[in-house]
Amino acid sequence: MRNVQAQPLVSPTEPMIDPFGRAVTYLRVSVTDRCDFRCTYCMAEHMTFLPKKDLLTLEELDRLCSVFIEKGVRKLRLTGGEPLVRKNIMHLIGNLSRHLKSGALDELTLTTNGSQLARFAGELADCGVRRINVSLDTLNPEKFRTITRWGDLSRVLEGIDAAQKAGIHVKINAVALKDFNDAEIPELIRWAHGRGMDVTLIETMPMGEIEFDRTDQYLPLSQVRADLASQFTLADIPYRTGGPARYVTISETGGRLGFITPMTHNFCESCNRVRLTCTGMLYMCLGQNDDADLRKALRESESDEHLSQAIDEAISRKPKGHDFIIDREHNRPSVARHMSLTGG
């Protein structure tokens, strides 16, 4: 058999630093605004999606991600929409995995609704994906269909099974929704921890126009934590995954539970991430409208120098924090664009 020498490991690159001294080491990339679900807190039922001609090609996404990695990004998360509905997405993931093999990237991961996981779990594992987040707000099939408008819970559970069998660590992300799933959060935690999965609870965020009043859905996680503390023994721990969640352990289950609280206790002081949309717009903050058009810089020159300068200029504008509020008087989102465009 022919000997194949391993690729030399790349020396870590100094990260980009924003105006407030925070290192930018985490890039979230929305590869599509399309999704096979229509979760009520995320999308309008009759969404108008971007024309496909406006989307970056997979080759352009690869080039952009690679420049960010050269500039010190160590964690790359693919999001959507639903990333696994993007045509030929595994071609992109397979190409990006070269940065894992070289040592330039610590982690390549994705956030998914789980609907396509049974199909792609094996390929994802082969590409070096070791952890994924699966969005799952309820274990009740009828409520699941209601919140997603037409999703099939059994298909998602099959996908989770496939991912775990492929050796991928699954974390469950659940949006806490008042009078919808608040009573079943303890059951969801027990189920996930019983399968070796962490859980992260998320406050609903005021992004994009939807048919429902978000003030009716909003549930502060401080209240959820207090309710959980009456049933479980919670202990704060310093565990971090590179994201904004603050974690506790639950003695009764032995598992970890995270809280993402953009409304009641924001995570801006340690923000290490920026977001790239499928059209090449870079958002320095989830809760601000300031953006940078990297598609223009990408297509103006085959050289990456101009693109690198555009990224530097954008990072120099990264704000100190977001402006999320729940506008109870006017029922308006703080940010007009939908999460499916920015990348959840």
Curated annotation (Swiss-Prot):
[4Fe-4S] cluster 1 binds at C35, C39, C42. The gene is moaA. Binds 2 [4Fe-4S] clusters. Binds 1 [4Fe-4S] cluster coordinated with 3 cysteines and an exchangeable S-adenosyl-L-methionine and 1 [4Fe-4S] cluster coordinated with 3 cysteines and the GTP-derived substrate. Catalyzes the cyclization of GTP to (8S)-3',8-cyclo-7,8-dihydroguanosine 5'-triphosphate. GO terms for biological process: Mo-molybdopterin cofactor biosynthetic process. Residues 19-245 form the Radical SAM core domain. Monomer and homodimer. Its cofactor is [4Fe-4S] cluster. Its EC number is 4.1.99.22. The keyword ATP-binding does not apply. Belongs to the radical SAM superfamily. MoaA family. GO terms for molecular function: 4 iron, 4 sulfur cluster binding; cyclic pyranopterin monophosphate synthase activity; GTP 3',8'-cyclase activity; GTP binding; metal ion binding; S-adenosyl-L-methionine binding. Keywords: 4Fe-4S, GTP-binding, Iron, Iron-sulfur, Lyase, Metal-binding, Molybdenum cofactor biosynthesis, Nucleotide-binding, S-adenosyl-L-methionine. Pathway: Cofactor biosynthesis; molybdopterin biosynthesis. NCBIfam families: moaA (TIGR02666). GTP binds at R28, R77, T111, K171, R273, V274, R275. It catalyses: GTP + AH2 + S-adenosyl-L-methionine = (8S)-3',8-cyclo-7,8-dihydroguanosine 5'-triphosphate + 5'-deoxyadenosine + L-methionine + A + H(+). This is GTP 3',8-cyclase. It comes from Brucella canis (strain ATCC 23365 / NCTC 10854 / RM-666). The keyword Iron applies. S-adenosyl-L-methionine binds at Y41, G81, S135, M205. InterPro entries: Aldolase_TIM (IPR013785), Elp3/MiaA/NifB-like_rSAM (IPR006638), MoaA (IPR013483), MoaA_NifB_PqqE_Fe-S-bd_CS (IPR000385), MoaA_twitch (IPR010505), MoCo_biosynth_MoaA/MoaC (IPR050105), rSAM (IPR007197). It is an enzyme of class 4 (lyase).
